Amino acid sequence: MRTEYTDFAAVWTRAETIPGWLTPAQARVLWDAASNAEPGSLIVEIGSHQGRSTVVLAAAARAAGATVAAIDPFVDGAMFGGPATRDKFEANVEAAGLRDVVRLIAERSTAVRPGWDEAIGVLYIDGKHDYWTVSDDLLWTRSVVAGGHVLVHDAYSSVGVTLALLRHVLAGRSLRYLGRTASLARFEVVRPAPADRLRMLRELPWWLRNVTVKVALRIGRLFGHHTTPDPY
């Protein structure tokens, strides 16, 4: 079954039923970025889980004449579920009528990247959140076309993600910071100006606030208090 989605509201009605951490406002950012992809271009997603973000990207990609490469190794673990999560991902993409525009690559992004030779129009990074993996995932930006967009989830929320951005983007010369929607940061592949770097630095108080809240939640759990999940 092939399904056409004419607007964001239509695809979000489908995507919001899929478990995940992407908010409606962040999903709209993905939709807008993918909708502006060039016909025939490729959108790469690193970290797909059960397909919540994949469905949004793929629906917009179809309308734009683009395709999506979804990269996720579907490893075992309490948060991820291994092969069972892959089954759910494939079922969700199929149920959304988007299977024909999604190419699943069930491998680690760090293993796929060295041999990658395709140009990327939009890159969405939401894989493993440790500093070293995110640092490697940011190397995928070398394949993004000039003027293309890079979206990074859990920026200024995850310690590993944020440190990697500060080290490789703030100090780099190829990505311009455009802003964020909660923890979803937006970048453009273009040489940044000093004002762009300053804009990134201004986000640090929000990051420190998030780290403080996360630490407080963990301390609270030690004393038997169970509250909402970590802020994203």
Where are these regions (language model features)?
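S-adenosylmethionine/decaboxylated-SAM
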Residues: 2-17, 27-232
